Amino acid sequence: MRSSRFVASRVEQGIIAAVLAGCVTMAANAQTVTNNGTGTNSGYFYSLFTSSGKATMTFPEDAQYPGNYAISWSGVGDMVGGKGWSTGGNMSVGYNVGSASGYNTISVYGWTTNPLVEYYITEIGSLYTANAAFKGSVSSDGHTYNTYEHSQVNQPSIEGTATFEQYLDAWGGASIGSNHTVTTGNHFSHWQSLGMNLGSFNYMILATEAYNGASGEVNATVW
């Protein structure tokens, strides 16, 4: 009996250790980002910016789909968040937006430095382009995108408040719930041909943006 009790104790200890290890792993994977932050999750870079209001980012399906993210927001002045890569560049970006509401745009979005440039390749929704200069159009991945350039003066950036250019390729016709591809090099080459120069690539993400007091949510995956 002593031996049996000892063995049972060892088994119980093993079960307890396994449960605790599982809890630690679950806690490590259950990341939550509120309002503002950058970091990594399941090998992907994430970024969340909120000027006002409230936004929360989680990664509910990252165990199966490492590029998955979800954001919920309410009353935001401007919210931009998503998942992708810490360094952008010429890539074939795949994505699927499983569900979305209350957003303005969903885009491949990123920054370069020297020069400081903020860029959008908009897949879903409509960019606000009233004050932007129309530069032409480009065909890529079976779609036609209209190209715009806009100067941002004393606005938030990855380098703090700054003056910089925005490059915008707007399509907006992608469907929710389907797989899509963005060949970023086609857009970058097109911009360069127009004299819209890019610098060194900073992060590049599949970004959801909402503004003007919007409330909503999104669940999307990038790869």
What are the roles of these predicted feature ranges?
Residues C23-V24, N96-G102, W111-N114, A174, ...:
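Short, flexible beta-strand-to-coil junctions
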